[in-house]
Swiss-Prot record:
This is UPF0324 membrane protein CTC_01844. It is found in: Cell membrane. Pfam families: Cons_hypoth698. It comes from the Bacteria. One of its GO terms (cellular component) is plasma membrane. Keywords: Cell membrane, Membrane, Transmembrane, Transmembrane helix. The keyword Membrane applies.
């Protein structure tokens, strides 16, 4: 009863926001703008009003952290290891190059623009993997600020809209094959809804293949989350050691405890993928779990939006938006060039 009293109001508020956001998203062809983006933006718009009601705080914090992890875990039901084999070795090669481009280029641009490494990393993850889902998965393990999460999702979304419009035109111009275009869209466009829109705008075959490639690309969340978790712990220890320099008794010489920093929700995510791969779960149940995962994700993004105001975003300046634009453009170009080299266009 105490839990319900403390958390229910905030959780129910985000659930209502998720329903409204889903309704608005359904009004748009191809669901070009996902419900998560609407929830985030509406939440930020309501922040000045909602922040006055402290009764919501516990529920909003619970939703933006605990329910977010649950959404990521359940998302595993949409994937299977057989999909990796289905897309083929050439597709995996392209994905490797786009991931290296997103994170390598993101790191260099982050240094150039003197950005906080967490915001830079979130934008790179959103661009290189799968938009808001990747950003949401990485944010807990690096203790990202809500404003950074909101900015990263907004930055990747803006370029996604541009790509949905230009990709089919470019595909026709370059006379790409259905599979070649599907691979390009699946590896270079970020959010799933945007991949669907860009893929099927070219052809049904291209749309089907682009979605498979996109889902396979999502599996790279696992190693990336582990790497970011380790980097964050190393930087925390480095900061502590610098603060206590000269005091040997407080100096952190011990090795990093992997079990302590390991993001266990990612292990459960893999368990869900493994269960899906066995085929023991009926499609009706896996479809329901997938829908539930998406709804919980929208709730979580809504909670993050409700905890973020536009002023905190403005503090980051214009550099992160430029960072996101350049990284997105690089990923698009690299994906196309690698496909050309492999003869897959």
């Amino acid at each position: 009863m105490l839990f319900i009293k403390k958390y229910s109001v905030g959780i129910l508020f985000t659930a209502v926001l998720a329903v409204i956001s889903g309704f608005i998203s359904n009004l748009i062809p191809y669901r070009l703008i996902g419900a998560g983006v609407f929830a985030l933006l509406i939440g930020m718009f309501l922040n000045p009003i909602v922040s006055k009601y402290t009764v919501l705080n516990k529920g909003l914090n619970f939703t933006s952290k605990k329910i977010l992890r649950l959404a990521i875990i359940l998302m595993g039901i949409t994937l299977s290891f057989s999909q990796v084999l289905e897309v083929g070795k050439y597709s995996l090669i392209v994905m490797v190059f786009t991931l290296i481009t997103a994170f390598g280029g993101g790191y260099l641009l982050g240094k150039l623009f003197k950005m906080d490494w967490k915001l830079s990393g979130l934008i790179s993850a959103g661009t290189g993997i799968c938009g808001g889902s990747a950003i949401a998965a990485i944010s807990p393990v690096i203790d990202a600020e809500d404003s950074d999460i909101a900015y990263a999702i907004s930055a990747t979304f803006i370029f996604d809209v541009i790509m949905v419009i230009l990709f089919p035109i470019a595909g026709k111009y370059f006379n790409m094959t259905d599979l070649g275009y599907g691979l390009w869209a699946g590896t270079a466009v970020n959010d799933t809804s945007s991949v669907v829109a860009a893929g099927y705008a070219f052809s049904d075959v291209a749309g089907n293949f682009s979605v498979i490639v996109k889902l396979t690309r999502t599996l790279s969340i696992v190693p990336v989350v582990l790497i970011f978790s380790y980097i964050n712990e190393r930087l925390i220890r480095k900061t502590k050691n610098e603060n206590f320099k000269g005091n040997e008794s407080t100096y952190h010489k011990d090795k990093i405890n992997i079990s302590k920093i390991f993001p266990w929700f990612i292990l459960l995510f893999l368990v869900m993928v493994a269960i899906k791969s066995t085929g023991i779960i009926p499609n009706t149940i896996s479809h329901f779990i997938s829908k539930l995962s998406k709804f919980l994700m929208v709730m979580s993004l809504g909670a993050i939006g409700l905890k973020t105001n536009f002023k905190s975003l403005a503090k980051s300046g214009f550099a992160p938006a430029v960072h996101g634009f350049i990284i997105s453009l690089l990923v698009v170009v690299v994906s196309f060039l690698v496909q050309m080299t492999l003869g897959q266009v």
